[in-house]
Amino acid sequence: MSYLFSSESVSEGHPDKVADQISDAILDQFLAYDDKAHCAVESFVTTGQVVIMGEVRSAEYIDLATIARRTINKIGYTKSEYQFDGNSCGILTAIHEQSDDINRGVEREEDENQGAGDQGMMFGYACNETENYMPVSLDLAQLIMKTLADIRKEGKEMTYLRPDSKSQVTIEYSDDNIPQRIDTIVLSTQHDDFIKKSNGEDDDDAMLAKIREDVINILIPRVKTHLSDKVLALFNDDIKYFVNPTGKFVIGGPHGDTGLTGRKIIVDTYGGKGAHGGGAFSGKDSSKVDRSAAYATRYIAKNMVAAGVADEMLVQVSYAIGVAEPVSIYVNTYGRSHVNMADSEIAKKIAEMFDLRPKAIERQLKLRQPMFFETAAYGHMGRKNEVVEKTFTSRYHEAKTMKVELFTWEKLDKVDEIKKAFGL
């Protein structure tokens, strides 16, 4: 019997994502000038106000307010009518030095023995539903949000768009877990009051009709241009569209809802598929295994599925604070393995093939680069691995331009080694 499964995404202008991007922009600025910096930076955004909190250990001084304003403006909050804009919002900073007790557990005389920054369990997941080994429901929801933001920033079509928006995609699966079709697309987008009645009042019905028409005739066709034939085949004439189903959406962003770093962890990962250990990513440097081990387990799961070990795989790793070696490694192939091995045997093989000590993960995935701002919107997983040039400026330092490799955990450079190890 078929079943339905849904995933959601949010835009870069969603309040929680504004907070995530501020936190990761600050992290990148520290790493650009001090690649040994330890950071745990939280941001809070509301009407006309940003609060930046957390713990940092670094030899460098960073202008937090300038980075926050630059980030907010880049997202698109540049107008006073939004009641939250980068040029005029108040910014309060409450950053203090990382605890000596925590630092003592992380730092070691030998880098290889660097302990985990905290206890906890982290998960990585991959499946063969899409070319980037992500759940198709989340992949589509993320792409809808990214494409809508591109349209907004181009300023040629749908010129009424404002930065805050959300999407949700529901997929019908067969009883053997194969995507069959798109059942429902939900989209809520912030917008201007752009149609008036003859008496000067807002014409809500006309605005909503226009937004729905543009979503179906402008946004969705552009989304389709980025899709493989396999995913395109899921579109059909019976898709249910819910566009701004509560009515007009003019008040939004941090003025409409308070935003906080780390509140979109399912959007950041697998859209409800797989599992999540509960630890957020943004604002944390790679000594925090909440982040680095989640990337490492994604790297493992993706390469394993790409190598043909299984059609779907979940990898869990756990740590004790201050201890380098993982406490446990767990694998679940959901009965979709292609090798004559129990999942526990696959887990043992992974432990032999991959070094999951925090310092080894940092080195393998190059996590001491200022590479994190790009992860803070539209998902940390399933993104394009590429080298980009980034420039960092500061009133306290000379401008610094450097090449940075993004999304290193999305590389498929272990496939041949895995095939050989598993006899595939």
Identify the residue ranges that each predicted region occupies.
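N-terminal, positively charged regions that mediate nucleic acid binding
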Residues: 1-40, 155, 415, 421
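Glycine-rich, mobile lid/loop segments that gate access to catalytic sites or pores
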Residues: 6, 66, 73-77, 81-251, ...
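Conserved phosphate/anionic-ligand binding catalytic regions in large, soluble enzymes, centered on
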Residues: 8-10, 14-19, 115-130, 250-275, ...
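Alpha-helical support elements that line or immediately flank enzyme active sites
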Residues: 12-31, 129-146, 284-308
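A short glycine-rich, hydrophobically flanked beta-strand micro-motif that places a catalytic Asp/Glu
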Residues: 37-41, 165-171, 239-243, 309-320
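Short, charge-patterned binding micro-sites
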Residues: 40-58, 321-325
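Internal helix-turn-beta structural module
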Residues: 46, 310-312, 319-424
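C-terminal catalytic subdomain
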Residues: 265, 270-314, 325-332
